């Protein structure tokens, strides 16, 4: 993806208009385009805190993995969504790590953790945007917990 295409992607976000020209260039200089085939591990115990993922196309599964190997899906991300928990080490209120897998072939942009941290410190609008997205994803998590604890198995299957 060329610089102009990246620019078009980011101009749609509300924080963009509040960034300095220097920070905009810094973001565009540090963004990396990645492709993962279906089934690939994007973030795992071996590769933690990648940075922020901007999903251009595909489906990502964000989940917890217990020491015993049990998995609990937190939520799924789809085209044009943003994965903030892939940069959990940069978010002071997040104290756990997640696993992220590509459920379908995925094209995404990665803003690595260190440049992401610098930009968040420089721009309160970006920081607010990221925390807002994170809380929106936690609403999905709470909805899943409610289904698990408060619906019968039959109700959950019917809703699926």
Language-model features: where?
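Polybasic "coupling" helices that flank or enter modular domains
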Residues: 121-160
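Cyclic nucleotide-binding regulatory module and flanking cytosolic helices
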Residues: 1-37, 82, 87-90
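Short phosphate-coordinating micro-motif centered on Lys-Gly-acidic
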Residues: 42-47
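Well-ordered beta-strand positions
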Residues: 35, 53-54, 76, 101
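Short alpha-helix-to-loop micro-motif enriched in aromatics/charged/Gly
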Residues: 67-74
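Glycine- and acidic-residue-biased ligand/ion/polar-headgroup-sensing regions
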Residues: 39, 50-63, 78-80
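Cyclic-nucleotide recognition modules
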Residues: 74-132
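Short loop/turn microsegments at loop-to-beta-strand junctions
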Residues: 31, 49-50
């Amino acid at each position: 993806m060329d610089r102009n295409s990246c620019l078009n992607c980011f101009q749609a976000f509300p924080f963009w208009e509040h960034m300095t020209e220097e920070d905009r260039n810094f973001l565009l200089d540090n963004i990396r385009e990645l492709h993962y085939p279906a089934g690939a591990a994007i973030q795992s115990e071996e590769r933690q805190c990648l940075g922020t993922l901007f999903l251009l196309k595909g489906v990502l599964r964000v989940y917890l993995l217990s020491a015993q190997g049990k998995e609990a899906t937190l939520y799924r991300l789809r085209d044009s969504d943003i994965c903030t928990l892939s940069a959990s080490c940069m978010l002071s209120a997040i104290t756990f790590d997640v696993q992220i897998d590509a459920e379908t072939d995925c094209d995404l942009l990665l803003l690595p953790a260190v440049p992401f941290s610098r930009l968040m410190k420089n721009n309160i609008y970006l920081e607010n945007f990221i925390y807002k997205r994170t809380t929106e994803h936690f609403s999905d998590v709470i909805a899943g917990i409610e289904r698990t604890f408060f619906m019968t198995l039959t109700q959950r299957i019917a809703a699926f």
